[in-house]
């Protein structure tokens, strides 16, 4: 029967014929033929498909020493140590002395020695029941078994000693897989009838004219090339970076702030009353230790904030409340810190970072998520300028935007921004407005400032067509690789 072989298959079959190989494991064949195991396995499977070679996978059970077994072989079995200890003490010792001498192994040693009739335990005293030589002779077979396992010898299955060694965790079973190659044809005859098929046309073939005598393997020019899967950033990180790029292009400078924040910047500077419900423990996450920070470095700011609160909210403002540490609940705290430095106009800043709320994990909410906050201010800056800027940002994201009047504690006038989804629904995305005079007075800024902020995950869910916010944090490599923007 004629068989078509590749050049690699032909060379392997020729090696088998020349070196007399008929049957053996993959490792043995690799040594005999001088072919690396990876290439040998690949070519053997191809020859098996053509009925030339049989490839058999064998699974054999082996026994190996555990760490406890190696320790017993090197330092002695627990019962062996007990026998030697008692022999050195005249044949007996108290149970307490044995425990001190053998430590954690005392219980195993006493149990095994008593079971094998090597010791007698009575009245808190342990005595040798046989002489030292007889006791060690009883223990020797088990040690011999461990030595055989260590050397690679296969113990007799069903042996009582084998069961004991397994139950005591001295040895363990291991399944070892091996591949056996077996020729199904006479290699010399197969070579004589073989038709060699070349896969590559080389320069030497053209030069020598050998190509005229060869049969070439046909190529499927419509076959798809192998899919290349290069590394990529997590899609949520890519989305956040896109938002950063847009704001940088518009002339905004990114700023950062601490995750553990003073209530002074998270609430008080923003004219949020100290008895506001958002400050309660069911909404904010307070720090246990240290509970409070030092406000001495913000004396001027504290004085202005106190004056604004006491005049506006009609209560006695407490620096103790303002000095409490919390996990920041809004990135507007970073904007407050920046404004407190009294930047010269025009001021254009944004921040992207994590905020924390006392929320349960669910399909639409997380206790930890990202917010983007932006501020822009200048002499003569107006609410209309703010809306125009927001519309510009939305258009750069490919979004259609509309506004509705709204209320926020630290901006007036204020709006909510809605973007149109592909299904025609409008999604509430952000809040925006002009900082109230009380906020600007507290930070010492004398020009108008507009502000906006939104949850990044909320927008990302719409962009990627994700209905469960937890999917944005998937670590499944396939999901990360396949995630694509569904909106644009």
From Swiss-Prot:
L-phenylalanine binds at residues 332, 371-373, 410, 435. It catalyses: tRNA(Phe) + L-phenylalanine + ATP = L-phenylalanyl-tRNA(Phe) + AMP + diphosphate + H(+). Transmembrane segments: none annotated. Keywords: Aminoacyl-tRNA synthetase, ATP-binding, Cytoplasm, Ligase, Magnesium, Metal-binding, Nucleotide-binding, Protein biosynthesis. It holds the Pfam family tRNA-synt_2d. It is an enzyme of class 6 (ligase). SUPFAM superfamilies: Class II aaRS and biotin synthetases, Winged helix' DNA-binding domain. It is found in: Cytoplasm. The keyword Magnesium applies. Its cofactor is Mg(2+). GO terms for cellular component: cytoplasm. Its EC number is 6.1.1.20. Disulfide bonds: none annotated. The keyword Aminoacyl-tRNA synthetase applies. Mg(2+) binds at residue 412. Signal peptide: none annotated. GO terms for molecular function: ATP binding; magnesium ion binding; phenylalanine-tRNA ligase activity; tRNA binding. Its main location: cytoplasm. Binds 2 magnesium ions per tetramer. Tetramer of two alpha and two beta subunits. Belongs to the class-II aminoacyl-tRNA synthetase family. Phe-tRNA synthetase alpha subunit type 2 subfamily. This is Phenylalanine--tRNA ligase alpha subunit. It comes from Aeropyrum pernix (strain ATCC 700893 / DSM 11879 / JCM 9820 / NBRC 100138 / K1). The gene is pheS.
């Amino acid at each position: 029967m004629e068989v078509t072989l590749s050049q690699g298959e032909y060379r392997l079959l020729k090696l088998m014929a020349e070196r007399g190989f008929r049957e053996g494991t993959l490792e043995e064949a690799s040594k005999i033929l001088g072919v690396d195991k990876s290439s040998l396995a690949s070519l053997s499977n191809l020859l098996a498909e053509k009925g030339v070679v049989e490839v058999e996978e064998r699974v054999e059970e082996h026994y190996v020493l555990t760490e406890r077994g190696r320790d017993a072989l090197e330092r002695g079995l627990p019962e062996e140590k007990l026998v030697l200890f008692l022999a050195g003490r005249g044949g007996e010792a108290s149970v307490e002395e044995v425990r001190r001498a053998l430590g954690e192994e005392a219980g195993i040693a006493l149990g095994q020695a008593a079971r094998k009739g090597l010791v007698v335990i009575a009245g808190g005293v342990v005595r040798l029941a046989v002489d030292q030589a007889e006791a060690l002779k009883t223990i020797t077979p088990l040690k011999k078994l461990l030595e055989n396992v260590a050397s690679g010898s296969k113990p007799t299955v069903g042996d009582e000693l084998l069961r004991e060694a397994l139950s005591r965790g001295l040895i363990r079973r291991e399944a070892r897989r091996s591949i056996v190659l077996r020729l199904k044809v006479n290699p010399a005859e197969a070579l004589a009838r073989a038709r060699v098929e070349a896969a590559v046309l080389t320069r030497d073939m053209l030069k020598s004219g050998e190509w005229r005598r060869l049969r070439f393997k046909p190529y499927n020019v419509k076959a798809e090339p192998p899919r290349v899967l290069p590394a990529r950033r997590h899609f949520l990180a890519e989305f956040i970076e896109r938002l950063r790029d847009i704001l940088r292009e518009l002339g905004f400078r990114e700023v950062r702030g601490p995750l553990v924040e003073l209530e002074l910047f998270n609430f008080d500077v923003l004219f949020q009353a100290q008895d506001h419900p958002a400050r309660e423990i069911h909404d904010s996450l307070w720090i246990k230790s240290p509970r409070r920070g030092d406000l001495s470095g913000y004396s001027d700011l504290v004085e202005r904030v106190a004056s604004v609160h006491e005049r506006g909210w009609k209560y006695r403002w407490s620096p103790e409340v303002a000095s409490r540490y919390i996990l920041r609940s809004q990135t507007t705290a970073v904007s407050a810190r920046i404004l407190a430095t009294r930047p010269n106009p025009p001021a254009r800043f944004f921040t992207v970072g994590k905020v924390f709320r006392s929320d349960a994990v669910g399909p639409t909410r997380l206790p930890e998520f990202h917010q983007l906050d932006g501020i822009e201010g200048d002499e003569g800056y107006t609410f209309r300028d703010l809306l125009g800027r927001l519309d510009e940002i939305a258009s750069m994201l490919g979004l259609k935007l509309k506004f509705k009047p709204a209320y926020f504690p630290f901006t007036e006038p204020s709006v909510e921004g809605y973007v149109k989804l592909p299904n025609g629904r409008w999604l509430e995305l952000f809040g925006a407005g002009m900082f109230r005079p009380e906020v600007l007075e507290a930070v010492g800024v004398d020009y108008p400032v507009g502000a906006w902020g939104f949850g990044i995950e909320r927008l990302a869910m719409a962009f990627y067509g994700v209905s469960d916010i937890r999917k944005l944090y998937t670590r499944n490599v396939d999901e990360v690789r396949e995630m694509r923007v569904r909106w644009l």
